[in-house]
Design a protein with these regions (language model features):
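A generic structural signal for short hydrophobic patches within well-formed alpha-helices
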Residues: 13-14, 42, 116-117
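Short, contiguous hydrophobic alpha-helices characteristic of membrane insertion segments
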Residues: 14-20, 68-70, 124
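A general structural signal for well-ordered alpha-helical segments in protein cores
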Residues: 23, 42, 57-60, 77, ...
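Anionic, Ser/Thr-rich low-complexity intrinsically disordered regions
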Residues: 35, 51, 58-62, 66-69, ...
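Active-site neighborhoods of divalent-metal-dependent phosphate/nucleic-acid chemistry enzymes
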Residues: 69-121
Length: 124
């Protein structure tokens, strides 16, 4: 990975949105960086804050608007389903496969899920 896009999964995105232990450090880190994610983030992030105040929902939409998204296509979903091995959950496989679509443009993959990070590293 040698580009300038930083790929976020939902665990990292929600830490940017909510007040969690890693949030302040992650917020400082993201300043000036170009962010990307899967189209899946649109649903997963909104589901993660659906029970919260309207202001949090608005902040979620504003933050989502500034992130480049990889479209979910049948081919991408098929590739995600074919990742070898056990232990990688379905949504995590979709994030990893989405990141692989941007491989040449990526600086790194940001997640707080160890299994997902291991799969992303293993697959390149």
């Amino acid at each position: 990975m040698s580009g300038d896009l930083w790929f976020l999964d939902a665990s990292a995105f929600l830490k940017l949105l909510l007040n969690e232990p890693e949030s302040a450090e992650l917020e400082r880190w993201r300043v000036g960086r170009r962010l990307a994610s899967s189209d899946l983030l649109r649903t997963e992030a909104r589901r993660g804050v659906a029970h919260m105040e309207a202001s949090v929902l608005r902040s979620c939409d504003e933050l989502l608007a500034g992130i480049q998204k990889v479209r979910l296509t049948p081919a991408l979903l098929d590739r995600a389903g074919r990742i070898p091995g056990r232990g990688l959950r379905t949504l995590d496989a979709i994030y990893v496969t989405s990141a692989l679509q941007l491989r040449d443009d990526l600086a790194d993959f940001v997640s707080y899920d160890r299994r997902q990070l291991a799969a992303a590293e293993r697959l390149g």
